């Protein structure tokens, strides 16, 4: 006959197990009722109220983004260029100038296929180098540009040519301070000739080369040339490739004609000082040399 203690032990274990089952079942039932009342069962479709809240949050976010964009489309210095394009930190200005001069200089060694052949002239070199300097320089960018390019600086942080309110129409084409209507009435364009660059997109700096910095533009005015009276060069200063260590390099496109596509030249100012035609000498006594100008986005 079994010991009485052995018979009571199983009875206690079954009672304890039954108690656990009852408690668990009650808790599960209570949770199910509560979740049905709140409608917040994980994985279930959102209720109409939840959808409405989500739409409201998205609308508020969109409205906030619009306010930021509108706030950026102001011209606090009344120079005609919206603040969103202007590079306000030293780091961004330095990065832009390094990319700008490097891209312009590289065209002397090998023209990039990304530079439209129909826009290869002196102002076209400035436009091309400006746009490409303002892009993000990732692996795809290097592949598109071709050989001979390397990282010369970080990217411009405050402005991205591919994601901004103006798109690639970053060159102003008329006098006046900026207004939002300028974006719709043609006062900004992807194109800018030498005259447009001088009058609306740059500021005069100096006629003294000692005060010029890399990235400045040399501008000449040749009134006897009917179609394009203004000629532009890019001041490199100490070029990336400088066999003699000179620090007064410039690069420019000679311009095209019906019989000549023109070419990109890289030369020292000290050499241009002795140009056979004195009207092309970058000296203060030459009235055709207007001086050094700086892009407004760097001001």
Label the model's feature ranges.
Residues 6-21:
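N-terminal Sec-pathway targeting helices
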Residues 36-68:
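Short, basic, low-complexity termini and linkers enriched in Ser/Thr/Gly/Pro
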